[in-house]
Each structure stands twice: as C-alpha cells, then as structure tokens.
Design a protein with these regions (language model features):
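Extended, charge-enriched "interface" segments that sit outside catalytic cores
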Residues: 1-95, 512-518
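A short core secondary-structure module
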Residues: 178, 182-228
Length: 518
C-alpha cells in the first residue's frame, strides 16, 4: 500500500462520526412531525447518540471475541459488557413511550445488536405485559427494577415446536398461590436475565395455543437459583455478544401474568409484537450504520484516479442503500404510531403491519449490509477493518428472530381473512401517487387469494408500495421515486429510463447534512 493510500484510510477512519444522532438527520425530521414534545426529547437523543458511539460500540468487538461464558446457573461477561449495559438502561429506554423508545433503540442499533439490543427488546415487552395484564401486586414488585437496571427475557421456543408454540409441552402446576414450571426451553436469548417470561401448559389445559399460560419466573429466590439450569450457550452466527442458551426448569417458582387461559394472547400480542416492532427498528438502525460506513469509505477511497463514489455503479449502490434504510425507518415509525392503540381500525392495521414490516425490514437489512461490504471490497470482509461483517451476521439473525419469514406472512394472511382488514391496510398507502394507487388496485384482487406459494411475494410488493407512499409523504421525493421504480412499477428497466442517472445523483447528493471531513 502506498503512503497516500494508507493516509486516505486513516483520514476515513478519523472522519467516522462520534454521535449516532447527529448523522441521522432524517430521524429527527420524522420525529419532529410526529411528537408534539420533540424539543424535550431531542437533547436526550443527542446525549444517547454520543454514548452509543463512544461507549457501547467500542466494547462490542471485544465482547464478541471473548463472548459470554456459562456454568449451570450463571452467565459471565467481560467487564465492558456491564458498563455498556448501565449506559443503555440509564437512557430510560425500557419503559419509555413508543416513539421515544423507538428513537433510542434506533440509535442503539447503530452498534448492531451489540449485546444489549435484544435484552432491551425483551425487557420492553415484559414491561408492557406487566403494565397491561399483571396484577397490581405483581406489577409493583417486579416492574420498578426493569426500568432502572434489571433485564427481562422471554422463553417461548421448545425443541419440538420452534415457531409452533402450540406444540409446547413445558408444564405449569399450581402450588397454593404460585405455580411451578417444569420443562426445557430451546432458544433462551438473554440467558442472564433477572426475570424470565416462560410459556407453559397448566395441568388439564386444552391442546394447542389455547392451553398455553404466560408466567414470570424470577431468576433468584433469596439469592439462590430458582429451579433452573443452563444446559449450554448457543454458538450463533451473529449477535454473539448476547447470551443465548438452552435452559431447563425443574419446579421453578412462577407467577402468572394475566389469566392462564390468556397466556398465548399475551405472549403473541404483547411480547412477540413488541419484539417484532423493535426488531424492525433495529434493522433500520443497522442499515443506517451500514450506509454510513459505505458512504464514508467511498468518499475517501480512490481507484483509477478518482474517488470511488464517482463511479456510476458505486453511486447506484449507495443510492439504493439510502432509499432502503429511509424506507425501513418510515414503515417502522408507521408501526410505532399504532403501538398501544385502542382504535379498532388501527389495531387491525397494527396486527398486519407489525408482522409484514418485520419481514420486510429484516430482509432489507441483510441486503443493505451486504451492499455495504461490496462497497468496501475485500476490506469489507475483514472483522477489524469495519463493523460490517458483524452487522451482516447480526442482520441474518434478525431475520430469524420472533418468527421466520414464512411464519410471519402466514400470520398476515390469516389475520387479513379473520379480521377482514384488507381495505383498511390498502387505504393506508393510498392518495399520494397515482402509480402507487394503481399497484394497490392490482394487489387488492391478488391479496384476496391466499395462495401459499405466491402470497409472500404479494405481501412484499404491498410493503414496498406502502414504503414508497410514506417516502412521498415525508417529502423524500428522489428516494420515493427510486423505491417506486425498483420495487413497485411493473416491468421497469433502468437502461430504458432516461432519468435514472439524474435520479441516482439526486439521491446521492441529497444527504448534505452528513459530512465526512476530508
């Protein structure tokens, strides 16, 4: 490598942002139009954006290299893990209102999963379940620690069932005023949590999901492990700084969250939906980081006598990444506006969108991370050159958390039929652009037919149409046009589009707020 080449790389590394919020101006713009008290929130976003880059992100690489270790009942982490965790909980993220929680989670995900995003999502779901379904006594005892330092987790999956929770066999037996849980859980993310939410079947309960109860299991009783042991920690492709294990319960003391017969409704409607929503927020934040890494590198890297950002294919790649990450944020904020809504139409829309959006954004995150790696070339595959390999691995795990793609689209198909909500869903994307409306008219008839082979593609096209409409509404005209042409217009061919180069240049140069100091 020449001295000039090494100097360019050093200047790129020195130019990296020191605050995740300051390089996400579109987040602030979007929140400003959705929150009346945004002025109160913005200083906290500035402060947390700095914490993410300066405290949390530097710790992740070491955490992944060393990784969590476990014995029968304890999980051990490097010291930096606890320090980063305290900084995350100090932000107030676990009990914040939806838009505030989403904004903080988006900034946290600048560092990928980072060992703390999944714990936050699980804790936020438990907080919401306690607030909405637990007895006052249970809420008073277990909620306050979750808002300040304690971590929650949710253990639903069993080896024989996977996403088929109705096949679960872990048992719950009443013991006076409490219950005892016995059985094994197969995917236990946040194995170090202070409070476990465990699904189990009460004795005599009916088969399937109707017989599933939802229980809170404290990790410790009087300082001693509460009837559980960790079989092992999983050796995962991604999210390696966070402990995921197999845990066996043997007579663990448990408290019901809500009535036992409502367990699956609470697990799916509160815990899983919270995680799916925040998974999408995390995917959007991860995409933002991937785009910034690629755009920053391309602005410094020179090849064949010019900066690589000036090559048409690199510019196209960056423009596509930017359109995807902006679209993902807006569709996820659309979900955020529906969280906790009691309006029947909004609740029906939320049932559909929280699943469809998780499916769409997690797929997009993997593709954007891969495009970013392509921009860096061979350097993009080196673990200690940039965070991109880690982000890519995390994104693949995000795809598979809280239901595979096929599980999610199947749920959407069932809900559209059960709640007769197709018109409500389509209407949310209408009235912005005739080309989007035409695509929705075509989709209406196709989405009425729930063909298991083709419905997933139809759902994906709907999500792309919705995201395009949201980009237009947000005033992101160039990004909306690019998204429309790539995903919504039938038979569009870039080579036949005389406006395509100008559109790419507009998308690329639009981001004047993010400066890389040359």
């Amino acid at each position: 490598m020449t001295a000039e080449g090494r100097e360019a790389l050093e200047r790129w590394q020195a130019s990296r942002p020191d605050n995740a919020y300051e390089v996400s101006p579109h987040l602030g713009r979007a929140l400003r139009t959705r929150l009346e008290d945004f002025a109160r929130l913005e200083p906290r976003l500035h402060a947390f954006g700095a914490v993410v880059v300066q405290t949390i992100d530097p710790a992740v690489r070491a955490l992944e290299l060393e990784g969590p270790q476990a014995d029968r009942t304890e999980v051990r982490f490097p010291a930096a893990y606890a320090e980063a965790g305290r900084a995350v909980w100090a932000s107030g993220i676990t009990g914040a209102p939806p838009f505030e929680q989403a904004a903080l989670f988006y900034l946290l995900s600048y560092a990928g999963e980072c060992g703390h995003a999944c714990p936050v999502a699980c804790t936020a779901g438990l907080v919401r379940a306690l607030r909405t379904h637990a007895s006052p006594e249970l809420c008073e005892r277990f909620l306050p620690p979750l808002l300040t330092h304690a971590r929650g987790s949710q253990f639903l999956t069993e080896a024989q069932g996977g996403s088929d929770v109705g096949a679960n066999v872990a048992a719950a037996v009443p013991d006076g005023d409490i219950w005892r849980i016995t059985g094994e859980k197969w995917f236990c993310s946040v194995a170090d949590a202070d409070q476990f939410v465990v699904t189990a079947r009460p004795a005599g309960a009916p088969p399937g999901t109707r017989g599933i109860g939802c229980f809170l299991v404290p990790r410790l009783l009087d300082g001693r492990p509460n009837g559980f042991r960790i079989r092992r920690l999983k050796d995962k492709l991604g999210t390696r700084a966070m402990a995921t294990g197999e845990i066996e319960f043997e007579g663990a003391l448990a408290y019901p969250i809500g009535a036992p017969e409502d367990g699956f409704r609470i697990a799916a409607g509160v815990l899983l939906n919270t995680s799916r929503w925040l998974n999408a927020v995390g995917s959007a934040g991860l995409m933002r980081r991937a785009y910034l890494e690629a755009a920053g590198f391309a602005s410094f890297r020179e090849a064949f006598g010019q900066r690589i950002e000036d090559f048409p294919l690199v510019r196209e790649n960056l423009a596509v990444m930017r359109a995807e990450e902006h679209a993902a944020l807006l569709s996820t904020l659309e979900v955020t506006a529906l969280v906790d809504s009691s309006d029947p139409d909004e609740a029906a829309y939320h049932r559909i969108l929280v699943n469809a959006n998780k499916f769409s954004t997690s797929l997009a995150a993997t593709k954007v991370a891969r495009r970013a790696i392509e921009t860096l070339g061979g350097n993009g595959t080196i673990e200690d050159f940039s965070p991109l390999p880690r982000l890519y691995r995390d994104a693949i795990v995000f795809e598979n958390w809280e239901g595979t793609h096929n599980v999610l689209w199947a749920q959407v198909a069932r809900d559209l039929e059960r709640y007769e909500s197709l018109e409500v869903v389509l209407e949310r994307a209408r009235g912005v652009d005739d080309r989007v409306d035409n695509a929705l008219d075509e989709l209406r008839e196709r989405m009425r037919e729930v063909d298991p082979l083709h419905f997933r593609r139809r759902l994906d096209r709907y999500m792309r149409a919705l995201q395009t409409a949201l980009l237009f509404r947000e005033g992101e005209e160039a990004l909306a046009e690019l998204h429309l042409r790539r995903h919504v217009l039938p038979g569009w061919e870039p080579a036949d589009d005389s406006d395509y180069r100008r559109l790419l240049d507009h998308c690329f140069r639009e981001e004047a707020a993010v400066q890389f100091a040359h």
